[in-house]
Amino acid sequence: MTLPATFEALITEANNLKLYKKLVLQLKKDFLYANIDLDFDEDILPSSLKLILHETVYKLIQEKFAEYLNLLYIIDVSEDAIKKLDGSDTLQLSEEVTFLILKREWQKVWFRHKYS
């Protein structure tokens, strides 16, 4: 499996395979496991999804760092990928982490679809 390099490529691939709703449901499920209730519908537009996720990750980094780390653990975002990011700009960091979260969730959905 080759992971998409951009948010747009990820969404295009998810839509082409008709897995976008499953991606959204996987995100909601993992965020709920981390006790973070994201209030959005499974029919959410990709641009709105990206914005909500970005805002949520930014707030977690700024205000609830332990919950942010717990979320990364639950979603199983690569620790090495996180360590490679530049943490000097929190806004940029939160955007990059949001994409890492989306990529990891996409992996889960894709593998479940492919091998089940």
Regions found by a protein language model. Give the residues of each.
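Hydrophobic alpha-helical segments at protein termini of multi-pass membrane proteins
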Residues: T2-A14, V57, E67-N70, Q107
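Amphipathic alpha-helical interaction modules
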Residues: Q26-N70
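Amphipathic protein-protein interaction modules
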Residues: L51-E95
